[in-house]
Amino acid sequence: MGLGAAARSAAQSFDRIAADYDRLGDLSENDGIMGWLVSVLPSVGGRALDLGCGAGRHAVLLAERFAHVDAIDLSLPMIEIARARRSRPNVAYRQADLLAATGSGEYDLVLSVMTLHHVPDLQAALAHIRGLLAPGGRIVLVDAYPAESAHPARRILHLLVPLRPRLHAGAVLRFRANLARRGPATAWEIYRLSIRKEWLDHRVSDRFSSREELDQCCATLFPGCQLERLGGTVVGLTWDRTL
């Protein structure tokens, strides 16, 4: 099945930064997210699905726990990096849109990390993800959800200051933090990659849903789910489907 227009646009954006994306992951892997995933993923299972797998960083974690892992991503260069760097005998990487993922009720685990802010309709995406889960299975989702309505000053700032300068300023702040945490060489490389035109172009295309939107979706699709703040606006969600 071919990609739709929105999916093609997102794929092209990722295609241009695939190597940088993977390198940044090597340099600045979010230990908070990875540590949380290790704590909430089942220790063993049958079939798992990684939606928006990127270069396979989380698929290899699933491969240690599940008999088979399907890992999909919009970007073919990302998939090629995953196959080259993180191939596992029980992981099948393929290019596909999240909304085109098939296997209704087949998966014991469905995982998505920092992918949902690229979908045009959060409710539709979450409903589709729920449909992929087998009875007794678990959904684990991670993404950023700014609470815009609680911060009117932030909305004013966003109106007055264009996104690109704000992203550049954020890279400077992270550089300062990384100097102490990772040393000058690594801090400089992270900063250099973060201010490249292709990377900033990609970041400008991000469209984050609000925390309020997430809460509304969870009330109807994932009643009783667990939500945990993992740092800043990043939220981890777990939900178990009853038998």
Question: Which residues does each predicted region cover?
Answer:
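A short glycine-rich, Lys/Arg-flanked "PGG" loop and its adjoining helix->strand segment in the class I
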Residues: 124-135
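Class I SAM-dependent methyltransferase SAM/SAH-binding core
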Residues: 55-100
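Conserved class I S-adenosyl-L-methionine
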Residues: 1-44, 46-52, 61, 78, 140-174, 178-180
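A conserved beta-strand element that flanks and buttresses the S-adenosyl-L-methionine
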Residues: 111
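Short catalytic micro-motifs in class I SAM-dependent methyltransferases
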Residues: 114-115
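Short alpha-helix
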Residues: 205-223
